[in-house]
């Protein structure tokens, strides 16, 4: 998912924590 991709994790802190 998104949180396994560093850039997506950075751009989605409300999803990934």
Curated annotation (Swiss-Prot):
Coiled coil: none
Effect of residue 11 to D: Important decrease in ability to inhibit alpha-7 nAChRs
Localization annotation: Secreted
Effect of residue 10 to E: Very important decrease in ability to inhibit alpha-7 nAChRs, and moderate decrease in ability to inhibit alpha-3-beta-4 nAChRs
Keyword Nucleotide-binding: no
Record family assignment: Belongs to the conotoxin A superfamily.
Protein name listed in UniProt: Alpha-conotoxin OmIA
UniProt organism field: Conus omaria
């Amino acid at each position: 998912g998104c949180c396994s991709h560093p850039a997506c994790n950075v751009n989605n802190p409300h999803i990934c924590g």
